[in-house]
Amino acid sequence: MVLGGCPVSYLLLCGQAALLLGNLLLLHCVSRSHSQNATAEPELTSAGAAQPEGPGGAASWEYGDPHSPVILCSYLPDEFIECEDPVDHVGNATASQELGYGCLKFGGQAYSDVEHTSVQCHALDGIECASPRTFLRENKPCIKYTGHYFITTLLYSFFLGCFGVDRFCLGHTGTAVGKLLTLGGLGIWWFVDLILLITGGLMPSDGSNWCTVY
């Protein structure tokens, strides 16, 4: 069929091509406008404040609205933060008072014997929370672990205690040499150290606690 000197099929084909080209141009304009809006305008918080970038690419929010889903970084659970080791003041009470936190001594057998202090913590990268991202987390025990295991030390004391191996491992070098020279105090010192280990009277010399075996 011919319409105005042109076949109808040719006109339909030209119309479809024009519609396809128009759709492509429209999609290109929409996607370009969306990408410009996403990069040019900063995301706003629920309170209307801009959201700057924090360290590690994490968003640093300002806490203002108590009904906002964004919480303070200091309220994050332990699995979302990383904390430093407690500060060791090595018995210097003046330094502890000036800093406001830290441990004068480490270790202890009972809960009441262990000091507790605050430590510096920060939110992990990628976790969105209201600043400040670095804060103090309280009630951390003054305990450290340096690789001493109770079972291993007890076996050393039982089988090699006459040669002072148990005290050498715990860092009590002076008494270990005396125990070695006297062959465990003719067996008396060997037996006494076994009792001290079991009752908690003989611990590592650096004030650390026994490592826990899970």
Swiss-Prot record:
Residues 166-182 are cytoplasmic. Glycans are attached at residues 37, 92. Its main location: membrane. It is a multi-pass membrane protein. Keywords: Glycoprotein, Membrane, Signal, Transmembrane, Transmembrane helix. It is found in: Membrane. The gene is TM2D2. This is TM2 domain-containing protein 2. Pfam families: TM2. Residues 1-35 form the signal peptide. Residues 40-59 are annotated as: Disordered. Residues 36-144, 204-214 are extracellular. The keyword Glycoprotein applies. It comes from Homo sapiens (Human). It comes from the Eukaryota.
